[in-house]
Amino acid sequence: MDTLLAPTETARRDYVRAMAAQHRAGGPLQREFYTSPDIFQEDMRRIWGRYWLYAGHTCQIPRTGDWLTYEVGSDSVIVVRGEKGEIRAFHNTCRHRGSRVCPAETGNSRRLVCPYHSWTYGLDGQLMMDTKGDFGVDRSELSLHPVKVRAVAGLIFISLSDNPVDFEDGFATIARKLAPHGLERAKVAHQIDYVVKANWKLVFENNRECYHCPPNHREYNTATYDVHRDNGNFDPKLKAEMEQIVAEANARFRSLGLDEGDAQSTMTGAHWRCHRTPLMKGFTTQSLDGRPVAPLMGDFKERDAGTLRMTVFPNFWQHANDDYACASRLTAIGPAETHVRVLWFVDREAIEGRDYTLDRLLPLWKLTSEQDWDICQWNQQGVSSSRYVPGRYSLTREQNVAHFVDWYLSEVTK
């Protein structure tokens, strides 16, 4: 049965559709899509409320009773490691009077105990106290509300919808391509939280192209060959060199038993993508000098496995090398504000100071990320101007941004 929308929700939906009708294909969105509180509410309902969202990595909750919470809009979700090692997720709201059950961000508990009146739940979400006599209802009717959750190759995805957007092909591809990296046997070496003063779509649009990389990402440019392609530099000699690098790298990936193909969803705009690419000649990992920064991870026995790039709309991207991985989790918190958590992962047996140091592990992606946040904030300031008029995307260097916008408009207007 269709959900009955309140009058304000109906008006918001109609407003979004009217604004979408003004969009000119091949160009950026209208200003209101980056600034309007009403459109932001529709984003949260139609996109963030329906899609699978990256919540964390399984290695963040390795032991029975370990849990983390993830805030999305007005919702909070508990992700917990169950008695048999399974990953479960629940709405973080007590079935008594609605208090947060787990007010902290992480913890370990044999039971989930609400701090308000000590209502106690098992790690399976079942209420453990008798309520029939005092409350007139059987405790089986008062379990924590479950949340859809999938753990795939060390990644945890949750969905706030009872009927989330289909992601089965994505889960299967991620499981196959990411498995050699052994992220379920990793640990968080470091994390940094940022509040980026920009709409979440601008942050993701920036991630979808490297046209901006040559003037902004000196460190990233030294490690990544396809920056030159995205910058429109099609010098025949460079093109031939890149094609040779790719051919040699793919042969090496196959010899290592790695799936080197490019895989993405077949939906409009492709809401997920997963592909392995080579690094610049002389680079075995994404570091400032190309040299390893940590011990090999997962199943790798030798170095130079390129980098496995993953993107999942609306809130996740990750680069996984053979010695470390760096993941970014976006959370939309307002029309012009996005929380971004950047996490670095290494093998769980690696010891800081002996096997890796943060001054070598962090710089490339810390610098690149912070450069991006500046760009996104300047972009937000510009599109907020009364004089902003959407321009045009490059046909050869920003096609992925156009695909993202197509995907977004298709989903937010449904």
Locate each region found by the language model:
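Short hydrophobic core segments
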Residues: D43, T93-C94, V113, V203, ...
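N-terminal pre-ligand scaffold of iron-sulfur
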Residues: M1-A104, K148-V152
